[in-house]
Every structure is written in structure tokens, then in C-alpha cells.
Amino acid sequence: MINYAHRGASDYAPENTLSSFYLGLLQGANGIETDVQKTKDGVLVLFHDDTLDRVSNMQGKLCDYTWDELKEAEIYGSCTTGFYDRIITFREFLEKFCRYDIHFAIELKGTDVEKVKL
């Protein structure tokens, strides 16, 4: 049976961040579910919503920002710890987690998904 950490351990750490994914694995997940979107300059990043408003200190659509701009975003969560993390690229995610014997569920978001090349 696959136990997915949905956006990581998003009840305890900011969703779709390294801290959330590692915590999900520490809590016993053997799979990670995440969302991939493209930035304005074509970088694939992990983020669920179309806009940054709900979970970050930035406003507006993710696709309107470049990766250099998004690197500065602070990602908060539904957790009340006051802790924040940052947006990561899909490449960084793969480099960190492909070494583990786990499953992945990747949802491609946005209007440009047919143009995504891995």
C-alpha cells in the first residue's frame, strides 16, 4: 500500500517544500504527491495554487514571476509554527528524492502543461 505525503506533510510544514517532504517521509510516507508549474521564464517549480496569495508573502499569479523573483518568496503553511520555507524547482526535488525507494504522484498545473519537457 502506498501512503502518500500530500504536498508533503502539509499539516505540519509549508506545503510542497523540502521541509514538508522530508517530514512526510519521517512520518512514514512511502510516496510524495506534489504539483509542478512553470514560471514566467520557463523554470519548473513545485507549487499548488495558481496564485501565491494563500501560502506566501507574495501576491499574484505564479506564472507572472521569474524564478529569480520566486526564490525570494517565503512559503507559509496552514501550520501555526511561524516557520517558513522556500519554493523549490522540480529539478531540485528530483535530485533530493529520486535516491529514495518511494513513489511519486506529480500533477502538472497551469495552461502550459503540454509544453513541459523533462
PLM features per residue range, with description:
Residues 1-118:
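Phosphate-group recognition and catalysis centered on beta-loop-alpha active-site segments
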